[in-house]
Design a protein with these regions (language model features):
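Well-ordered alpha-helical scaffold segments within catalytic/enzyme domains
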Residues: 52-53, 57, 98-107, 147-158
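Surface-exposed loop and adjacent secondary-structure segments within mature catalytic domains
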Residues: 120, 128-146, 150-152, 158-200
Length: 209
């Protein structure tokens, strides 16, 4: 309740009309990062509608407390923790399209997302493959590793990269005890044989991606 009141203070004395205008201004700032020229207004509408939907997720799952510190409710421990957290995203196939876009056009946002991934690992022992808000058993493979690697190779550094490296290595050699799509199902076969035998698992190609 106290945090809800704290969040309400961010509105100040603005009325609904002013808040709506602030929202429009913010979206224009975000979408205006890319300028497109086309004589066909429908092409412009399509592009910016798609860009708008692209940057809706991952959803920010953090806020600032009364001391001005960034905090989040951890879906993994059920407690309030310091730092960033993001949710409502699956990395298949956003690792090859959305996250490279974030690295190019919104790098400061993806630095926060990377910090949130590090917090997910520290609080749960694994990187997420599909967060909603915690680990969800509906995604296979280690696409989170691609998200982490692409951010680092794109030059992003404003987060704990060493912790994320540990998370990537761990996720390639372990399976979550309750959500077997998190981690690398079949890693024992792959590490020993270099492949996963056909009859050992369903979706045999995806777990070792």
């Amino acid at each position: 309740e106290s945090q809800a009141w704290q969040n309400l203070q961010e509105l100040g004395q603005a009325d609904m009309q002013q808040l709506c205008q602030q929202g429009r201004n913010r979206w224009n700032e975000v979408l205006g990062k890319i300028e497109v020229e086309d004589e066909d207004i429908d092409h412009l509408r399509t592009f910016y509608s798609c860009l708008y939907r692209s940057v809706l997720f991952p959803r920010a799952f953090y806020e600032k407390n009364a001391a001005g510190e960034v905090v989040h409710y951890s879906p993994y421990s059920g407690t309030v923790q310091k730092g960033y957290m993001f949710t409502d995203t699956g990395f298949w196939d956003t690792f090859r399209c959305l996250f490279p876009l974030l690295n190019l056009m919104y790098p400061s946002v993806n630095e926060k997302i990377q910090a949130g991934l590090a917090n997910t690992y520290l609080e749960s022992g694994f990187l997420p493959e599909w967060a909603s808000p915690g680990h969800r058993g509906c995604m296979v493979g280690n696409n989170s590793a691609s998200v982490v690697a692409d951010a680092y190779l794109s030059g992003l550094r404003g987060y704990d990269a060493e912790t994320l490296w540990q998370a990537v290595v761990h996720g390639a050699n372990a399976v979550h005890p309750e959500v077997n799509s998190t981690g690398r199902h079949g890693f024992e076969y792959y590490n020993k044989l270099g492949y996963v035998p056909y009859l050992s698992l369903i979706h045999i190609s995806e777990p070792t991606r």
